[in-house]
Amino acid sequence: MSPLKLEPLLQTLASRSDDIEAARRLPADLAQEMAKAGLFRMMIPKTLGGLQLPAIESLKIMQEVAAADTSAGWCTMISATSAYKSGFLDHDTGREIYGDPMGIYGGIFAPMGRAVPEGDGYRVSGRWSWASGSANCTWLSGGAMVFEGGEMRKLPNGAPDSRMVIFPAAQAELHDTWHSHGLKGTGSGDMSVTDILVPASRAVSLMKSAPTHEGALYRFPTFGLLSLGIAAVALGNAKAMIGDLVDLAASKKPTGGGKVLAQRGYAQTGLAQATAALRSADAFVTEAVGRAWDEAEAGDDLSVAARADLRLAATHATRTSAEAARTLYDLAGGDSVFLKSPLQRRFRDAHVMTQHMMVNPATWELTGRVAFGLPTDATFL
């Protein structure tokens, strides 16, 4: 059971799915209601007024929200995982950014920005794509490569020095570039900043910054959490499709014969297979997160094997969800092609999620190398 009281909010989100998609962003009043419910504070330390939930609880909540409305679930995931950086900031900076109980956060990990050291900070410019939920955010963040003397700065291990720079949302320009066929309501357009000064205290290194707050959550890998968040939204979306199909099948009579769809053998088989696939994928996620959580609670750095399992489970769940969505969409026949059908929207949403770099097919190779015991660059595990 969710530690948050979400049922009235979930009903509201479900009833306004058409509005969310038409707006191509999460309406401001809904974003405020979601903030009030605590959805954006799940991964913020308790010492900063956050919830600091166990990873699996946050993921289950993301599923619940996505089952109500996928775009709202996606925005929940992005804001929560963006706020995860709070566990790596000094306490004063953390309170400045994450102390507001109504704060909304967003960001893009991809290092599309450029950060040049200046005084006790960085002069930052950049433009980032996929800035989901940015129109409602109070703080935004973006990945940036550090340059010194015109050259990219390297870490001792030879990797580029990449930082997540955090800045007030008012300093960013938002660009209306989000014209997609799925996840339409996420407002995932571009954002940019030009020549802003970001204090060093608001520039987190994903490669070398150590947690500044206690707890197993902050020993989890950043990319593992992000990929699992995507998987949670995908699973919630696809599970909701099962209910949509069951509702339709009770009365739909396919051409040929008098039986409703629910009485057709092929529909029963397809529904059973989709259900089994989704429950199995969900179980793999739960198993992988549980194993990693046990290691993190022991105070250890997560093993490469545990980190690989997180990425593998996330990619498998996201792609399995899209396959199940295809099955359910097909079973609905011609009814699924109309815009009034929730099945067509969820089908589109499912397939947009598979395109995220954290769950793309390259993950199979990365985790397969670990399974074979081959030397593997574990940076993105």
Indicate residue ranges for each PLM-predicted region.
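C-terminal helix-coil-helix/basic helical segment that borders enzyme active sites and/or dimer interfaces
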Residues: A14, D18-E21, S280-H316, R326-V337
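N-terminal glycine-rich anion-binding loops that anchor highly charged ligand groups
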Residues: R25-R41
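Internal helix-loop-helix
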Residues: K36-M102
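A structural signal for short hydrophobic beta-strand segments in well-ordered beta-sheet cores
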Residues: G113-P117
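DPxDG-like acidic metal-binding loop motif
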Residues: R127-Q171
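Glycine-rich beta->alpha junctions and the first turn(s) of the following alpha-helix
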Residues: H181-L278
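Generic structural signal for well-ordered, non-transmembrane alpha-helical segments
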Residues: G236, A272-R279, R311, T315-A322, ...
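Glycine-rich phosphate/cofactor-binding loops in nucleotide/flavin-utilizing enzymes
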Residues: G334-L381
